């Protein structure tokens, strides 16, 4: 059949509504080229490590596919000429990867964890407030 690839896409956050339509178009291209999609994950909007085109967030997608080189070339051309896709990366893999990704596992685990306490959440609620009456020292008399 074909070779195995892992593809990660960063989609412009304003285009999040069109992500499903984009995925359907890519799925059709892969399946028409006699390819298989082993894994498809929508990671949602996530913080970028650095700004891309003055954006700090993007919609992440990840696919593990098995296709011929010609189909991959068509996909990469679609990614390259689609203004909604900020970045794309296609990596050749040794075999199919159907296990859930680390990001999706950690996303699932977050629902089980209790909410973390912030530093400014103290039991009495007055962190950083001093009870000293001489803080305003002679400022009131000087006015």
Curated annotation (Swiss-Prot):
Residues 95-143 are annotated as: Disordered. Binds together with bS18 to 16S ribosomal RNA. The gene is rpsF. GO terms for molecular function: small ribosomal subunit rRNA binding; structural constituent of ribosome. Residues 105-121 have a biased composition (Basic and acidic residues). This is Small ribosomal subunit protein bS6. SUPFAM superfamilies: Ribosomal protein S6. Belongs to the bacterial ribosomal protein bS6 family. The keyword Flavoprotein does not apply.
């Amino acid at each position: 059949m074909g070779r195995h690839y892992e593809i990660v896409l960063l989609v412009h956050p304003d285009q999040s509504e069109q992500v499903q339509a984009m995925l359907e178009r890519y799925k059709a291209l892969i399946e028409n080229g006699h390819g298989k999609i082993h894994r498809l994950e929508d990671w949602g909007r996530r913080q970028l490590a650095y700004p891309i085109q003055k954006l700090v967030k993007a919609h992440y997608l990840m696919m593990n596919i098995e296709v011929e080189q010609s189909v991959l070339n068509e996909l990469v051309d679609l990614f390259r000429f689609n203004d909604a896709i900020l970045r794309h990366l296609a990596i050749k893999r040794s075999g199919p990867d159907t296990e859930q990704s680390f990001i999706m596992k950690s996303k699932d685990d977050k629902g089980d964890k209790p909410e973390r306490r912030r530093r400014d959440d103290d039991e009495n609620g007055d962190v950083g407030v001093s009870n000293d009456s001489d803080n305003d020292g002679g400022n009131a008399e000087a006015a």
